């Protein structure tokens, strides 16, 4: 949600900035706007606008706020959302589809909290961002928004998130509120440890616990904890891949990351994290009595992770970005498998009932 390293908060080439917007009438086009204009002149305009095109065409007074929230880079919201959907689908009663209401609540919450995390990140990092070519045009770094404006936006995002959280049971409210220390403190981790991606994993996958207790009312089962462990290791994979784009900048400004810590041994570590992810998801499936579609989906996600780790070029920023974005496919594959597995649970229960 939150991070310079999650691609989300650090991929700032596309940030449009009106430098000194309060005192100047000089405007500059950002890279995403240029690409959008270029693309739209060469191809028929899509009937469905993309997130980046919506931000690029937004009113000038609104655009810096949308950019600060990373609305033009929705991959961060998806990566926050998928563990929530896994948990909700897994906690759904046998033979039923997951609640659209719950999925919608968590979808809105994922968008709001990821946006809030990006604001928090930029408030902490604005002085770093001014020194880096790719980040110096972020709204806070370049001055198109003030700290006061960012804090006002943050207050609105957190208030809206709280309103959504209060729709859940009180156990879930307590679980959700307990994540705030991680949300606020995560951006500081990269100043003190080479493992900020681990802290990100703890923070970013809280929905794996919250989705379960939103339906079940407690965390008495081991299943959500296995899912949380799997999602944490998954984050270590995709965010380490992403962090390799920024190695030179990180060294220059003194920011730490797993990309710098693991270096040439990155693929060995990513392979180990991949094994841990699959093992944890297997344990989660056993603990929650999943049926065969879950394990088919798990095999597909294993292949997807293997492809990522096996083919990523950690010295090629473009390839790292492509592999990073591909993780949304893993999210939807696993979600689909859990939904199908839950629908079949009732059939399996009927079939085995005569033998008990």
UniProtKB/Swiss-Prot annotation:
Membrane-spanning residues: 71-91, 93-113, 150-170, 195-215, 269-289, 332-352
Keyword Transcription regulation: no
Source taxon at top rank: Eukaryota
Example of a GO cellular component annotation carried by this entry: mitochondrial membrane
Pathway: Cofactor biosynthesis; ubiquinone biosynthesis
Molecular function as annotated in GO: 4-hydroxybenzoate polyprenyltransferase activity
Any single GO BP term: isoprenoid biosynthetic process
Subcellular localization, as worded in the UniProt entry: Mitochondrion inner membrane
CC cofactor: Mg(2+)
Signal sequence, renumbered to the chain: none
Annotated Pfam families: UbiA
Keywords: Isoprene biosynthesis, Membrane, Mitochondrion, Mitochondrion inner membrane, Transferase, Transit peptide, Transmembrane, Transmembrane helix, Ubiquinone biosynthesis
UniProt topology in membrane: Multi-pass membrane protein
Name of the protein this chain belongs to: 4-hydroxybenzoate polyprenyltransferase, mitochondrial
Transit peptide: 1-44
CDD domains, A to Z: PT_UbiA_COQ2
Classification via InterPro entries: HB_polyprenyltransferase-like (IPR006370), Prenyltransferase (IPR039653), UbiA_prenyltransferase (IPR000537), UbiA_prenylTrfase_CS (IPR030470), UbiA_sf (IPR044878)
NCBIfam families reported in the protein's UniProt record: ubiA_proteo
Role noted for this protein: Catalyzes the prenylation of para-hydroxybenzoate (PHB) with an all-trans polyprenyl group. Mediates the second step in the final reaction sequence of coenzyme Q (CoQ) biosynthesis, which is the condensation of the polyisoprenoid side chain with PHB, generating the first membrane-bound Q intermediate.
Reaction(s) catalysed (UniProt annotation): an all-trans-polyprenyl diphosphate + 4-hydroxybenzoate = a 4-hydroxy-3-(all-trans-polyprenyl)benzoate + diphosphate
């Amino acid at each position: 949600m939150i991070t310079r390293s999650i691609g989300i908060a650090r991929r700032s080439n596309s940030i449009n900035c009106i430098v000194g917007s309060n005192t100047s009438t000089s405007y500059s086009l950002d890279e995403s706007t240029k690409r959008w204009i270029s693309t739209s002149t060469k191809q028929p305009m899509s009937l469905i606008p993309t997130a980046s095109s919506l931000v690029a065409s937004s009113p000038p007074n609104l655009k810096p706020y949308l950019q600060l929230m990373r609305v033009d880079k929705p991959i961060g919201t998806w990566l926050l959302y998928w563990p929530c959907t896994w948990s909700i689908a897994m906690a759904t009663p046998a033979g039923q589809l997951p609640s659209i209401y719950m999925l919608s609540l968590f979808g809105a919450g994922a968008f709001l909290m990821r946006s809030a995390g990006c604001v928090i990140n930029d408030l902490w990092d604005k002085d770093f961002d001014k020194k880096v070519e790719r980040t110096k045009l972020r709204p806070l770094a370049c001055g198109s928004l003030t700290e006061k404006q960012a804090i006002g936006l943050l207050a609105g995002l957190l208030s809206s998130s709280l309103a959504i959280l209060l729709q859940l049971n009180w156990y879930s409210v307590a679980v959700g509120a307990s994540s705030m220390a991680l949300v606020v403190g995560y951006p500081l981790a990269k100043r003190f440890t080479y493992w900020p991606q681990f802290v990100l994993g703890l923070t970013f996958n809280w929905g794996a616990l919250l989705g379960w207790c939103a339906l079940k009312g407690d965390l008495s089962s081991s299943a959500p904890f296995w899912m949380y462990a799997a999602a944490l290791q998954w984050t270590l994979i995709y965010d380490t891949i992403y962090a390799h784009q920024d190695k030179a900048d990180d060294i220059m400004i003194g920011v730490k990351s797993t990309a710098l810590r693991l270096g040439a041994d990155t693929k060995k570590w990513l392979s180990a994290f991949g094994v841990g992810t699959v093992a944890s998801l297997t344990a989660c499936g056993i603990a929650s009595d999943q049926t065969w579609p879950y394990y088919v989906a798990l095999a597909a996600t294993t292949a997807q992770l293997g492809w990522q780790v096996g083919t990523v070029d950690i010295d090629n920023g473009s390839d790292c970005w492509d592999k990073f974005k591909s993780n949304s496919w893993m999210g939807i594959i696993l979600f689909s498998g859990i939904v199908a597995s839950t629908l079949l649970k009732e059939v399996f229960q009927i079939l085995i009932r005569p033998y008990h």
